[in-house]
Regions:
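C-terminal interaction segment
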Residues: 1-55, 63-151
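Short acidic/polar active-site loop segments enriched in Thr and Asp
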Residues: 58
Length: 151
């Protein structure tokens, strides 16, 4: 099972497993490298890369946040004629996914996702803080509106 897989459409998530026969191949798979599995994750001839290519996964990305295995932090491939070809980052060190319309970069140990317009997407903790800030802002606007109405 991949560490992370992405489809371009909704799939049944309550099954507990990925079913290629039902869902088809994911558009993009991410594997986070570890000392115990990196050779299998990076093996395009017998390992996961081989299996993912045979399944028709169009984009395959491996990420090493610690950079102990991959000094560059990310190694990725795109499927062409049934074989994975190296997928290089663009000049800004972002890997742009043709399949799902995002770009990924690695800054330090953190992967950063950008939307198709280049805007950085918020991380989980940032989302909670932004929601709290918006709630506070909304409460203040409601208070000002009530005050203006004379309530």
């Amino acid at each position: 099972m991949p560490d992370v897989f992405v489809y371009r459409r909704p799939i049944e998530v309550n099954r507990g497993s990925l079913a290629l026969a039902l869902d088809g191949p994911p558009a993009l798979i991410f594997e986070v490298l570890s000392e115990s599995t990196y050779s299998w994750d990076l093996d395009l001839e017998r390992g996961k890369g081989y299996s993912y290519a045979r399944a028709g996964v169009r984009e395959y990305m491996t990420i090493d946040p610690s950079r102990t295995i991959l000094p560059e932090g990310i190694r990725a491939w795109r499927l062409a004629d049934g074989i994975y070809q190296p997928w290089q980052p663009e000049g800004d060190r972002r890997w742009r996914s043709e399949e799902i319309g995002i770009s990924i970069s690695l800054k330090g140990a953190m992967a950063t996702v950008h939307d198709a317009k280049g805007r950085r997407q918020l991380r989980e903790g940032e989302i909670a803080r932004e929601l709290a800030r918006k709630d506070t802002e909304l409460a203040e606007l409601r208070r000002l509106l009530d005050e203006a109405r004379g309530k």
